[in-house]
Amino acid sequence: MSDDRKAIKRALISVYDKTGLEDLAQALHRENVEIVSTGSTAAKIAELGIPVTPVEELTGFPECLEGRVKTLHPKVHAGILADTRKEDHLRQLKELEVAPFQLVVVNLYPFAETVASGADFDACVEQIDIGGPSMVRAAAKNHPSVAVVVSPNRYEDVQEALKTGGFSRAERTKLAAEAFRHTATYDVTVATWMSEQLAAEDSETEFPGWIGTTNTLSRSLRYGENPHQSAALYVGNTRGLAQAKQFHGKEMSYNNYTDSDAAWRAAWDHERPCVAIIKHANPCGIAVSDESIAAAHREAHACDSVSAFGGVIASNREVSVEMANQVAEIFTEVIIAPSYEEGAVEILSQKKNIRILQAEAPVRKGFESREISGGLLVQERDLIHAEGDNSANWTLAAGSAVSPEVLKDLEFAWTAVRSVKSNAILLAKNGATVGVGMGQVNRVDSARLAVDRAGAERATGSVAASDAFFPFADGFEVLAEAGITAVVQPGGSIRDNEVIEAANKAGVTMYLTGARHFAH
């Protein structure tokens, strides 16, 4: 691709976001570039004492319909779309008395921001830009002749290009690609919003008839789950882990991100101060504490200190200096929190490789998706919000009602077991997990694993949670033999009566929630 620089002699500017406009206009004026502009943009440039041609003067047609029609005119679009490499195009421009543009600077109405503000339907519709995307797409298509700029972040590039004889062909192509991404993102945002409005009015489904997402490459990662797999991080429009601020440590890996996401979600499932330690997307330990976040960390780590080695730690509260000192004694891949007490980052940074992240709370609403071959599965996020997640709605199926203290442990266990890959059994005591059985293909093995991880002493007197019903009594019997005092489970098995009978026989209290928390 040749250099083929196009000197900028004429520019069209129409921007909602006026950031950097003053410097841009002054730079163009210094190089004697003719400026054509619209509405408030033209007024702003004129206020600077810079000559500017209002677009209505160019077209001979007034702005109308409350500004809905400004630039939709042949004298504008012919000047943008003329391919100046073609003699026929140049001849037609001369006949039509239209001068070509070499630079188009446009940014669009703030549709996404208007929607986010909670504006009503009509107000959002008014912020759907028509003329702006038309000019951007036209200029991007004609990038062999025109440079298109859609972000104030590119204004310095414009100023540099003015000094070097214009943008090169390669630079114009890059700007065109950015412009098409810009309008595509805008259109996806509008289409998604409109589809969601229709879905909200449709009593048959809460899901939109069309889903579109846009994500931008943030950076390439060293590799994927395994060294032979290439990988990259793309970021979306919502804030979250992908936009986390990193204070220290090596670059995040693919596996670091997946484990951090699991840990972050697990910690924020709990309203009380909570620490979750995750390895391979499963909990090594989770604990809550009203005493301190450091206490929560101690108890979470104590659940399985062997597996916690090289794990990911997430806290839903500020990391204190006390907690930082504890973490600094343990090999940890990542620690993530909403904030850090003064001095905590410095303590953690004494460990060369630990990745220290600060992130906003995870999204606690909406839908999540998963790719399958040929399609996409979409579901409502599991936010521990089912009717059966409220202990007030639990059914006492066996034994006697437990004390408030034991009930708190059952509530904690029920919330924590959501973070465990199915089949999941979790043992808890005093607001902390003491044994976790995860990812087994039958519930008996998960129960055995949880008991084995806890050990006889910690299992005795603990409570248990099962993410789904016991299909037979054998899984429950493993827990009863280990000395648990109470268990919470969804119920719903055709053999519920056998399981409940086993609980009564063992003297174990059993609550049924009617809600399930599979995690695959």
Swiss-Prot record:
InterPro entries: AICAR_Tfase_dup_dom_sf, Cytidine_deaminase-like, MGS-like_dom, MGS-like_dom_sf, PurH-like. SUPFAM superfamilies: Cytidine deaminase-like, Methylglyoxal synthase-like. Keywords: Hydrolase, Multifunctional enzyme, Purine biosynthesis, Transferase. Gene3D superfamilies: 3.40.140.20, Methylglyoxal synthase-like domain. It catalyses: (6R)-10-formyltetrahydrofolate + 5-amino-1-(5-phospho-beta-D-ribosyl)imidazole-4-carboxamide = 5-formamido-1-(5-phospho-D-ribosyl)imidazole-4-carboxamide + (6S)-5,6,7,8-tetrahydrofolate; IMP + H2O = 5-formamido-1-(5-phospho-D-ribosyl)imidazole-4-carboxamide. GO terms for molecular function: IMP cyclohydrolase activity; phosphoribosylaminoimidazolecarboxamide formyltransferase activity. CDD domains: IMPCH. The IMP cyclohydrolase activity resides in the N-terminal region. Belongs to the PurH family. This is Bifunctional purine biosynthesis protein PurH. It comes from Corynebacterium glutamicum (strain ATCC 13032 / DSM 20300 / JCM 1318 / BCRC 11384 / CCUG 27702 / LMG 3730 / NBRC 12168 / NCIMB 10025 / NRRL B-2784 / 534).
